[in-house]
A protein has these predicted regions:
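Short, basic/glycine-rich phosphate-binding loops at helix/coil junctions
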Residues: 42-52
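A generic structural motif
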Residues: 31, 76-78, 102-103
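Asp-based, Mg2+/Mn2+-dependent phosphohydrolase catalytic module
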Residues: 1, 70-73, 87, 91-137
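Active-site neighborhood of HAD-like aspartate-dependent phosphohydrolases
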Residues: 1-39
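Generic recognition of short, well-ordered alpha-helical segments
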Residues: 16-20, 63, 92, 137
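Short, acidic loop-to-helix structural element flanking the phosphoryl-transfer center
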Residues: 52-81, 91
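Conserved phosphate-coupling serine/threonine residues in phosphotransfer and NTP-handling enzymes
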Residues: 83-85
Length: 137
C-alpha cells in the first residue's frame, strides 16, 4: 500500500470540542455559528486558542492507533488526514493525539477528502474508522 487517506474521526472525536467552542462563541460573542466569517472575523484564532487550552480534556492518545501509524510510516506508506473541521482545530487535535509527526498531508474544510486523494495520488486507500485503521496492518 502506497498511501492512506485517514478521516480524522478515525483518530479521535473532535465533535464535542467543536460543539463546545460554538456554544461558547454564541454565548461570549453573541454570534451565529453559521455566520462566523461575517460576525467574528478572527474566529479561527479564537478557536485555536480555545482548542489548545482544552484539548487535554477532549483528546486521549490511543496506543493501538499510534502503533498502526508508526507501522504504516515505517513501511513507507504516505499518510494523509482529512476532515471537514477547521484546520486550526484539526492541527490541535493531531498534536494532542500524537499523530502529527506521522502525517504527511492534512486537508480540512469542505472538499477535504477529494483534495487529500488528489495530493496522495492514485490508489490511496480511504480509512473512515478506527477499526478500519487498525485492520490495515
Amino acid at each position: 500500500m502506497k498511501a492512506v487517506a485517514i478521516s480524522l474521526s478515525a483518530l479521535g472525536d473532535m465533535e464535542p470540542l467543536w460543539r463546545d467552542w460554538l456554544d461558547d462563541a454564541r454565548r461570549r460573542y453573541r454570534v451565529d455559528g453559521d455566520a462566523l466569517d461575517q460576525e467574528l472575523p478572527n474566529w479561527r484564532e479564537l478557536l485555536e486558542r480555545f482548542a489548545e487550552e482544552r484539548a487535554p480534556v477532549y483528546f486521549r492518545r490511543d496506543a493501538d492507533v499510534s502503533s498502526t501509524l508508526r507501522q504504516l510510516r515505517a513501511s513507507g506508506t504516505r499518510i494523509g488526514v482529512f476532515t471537514d473541521a477547521p484546520a486550526e482545530l484539526a492541527r490541535v487535535a493531531l498534536s494532542h493525539l500524537g499523530a502529527e509527526r506521522h502525517i504527511e498531508v492534512l486537508e480540512s474544510g469542505p472538499g477535504a477528502q477529494k483534495r487529500i486523494l488528489a495530493a496522495l495520488g492514485e490508489g490511496a486507500r480511504v480509512i473512515d474508522t478506527r477499526e478500519e485503521l487498525l485492520a490495515v496492518t
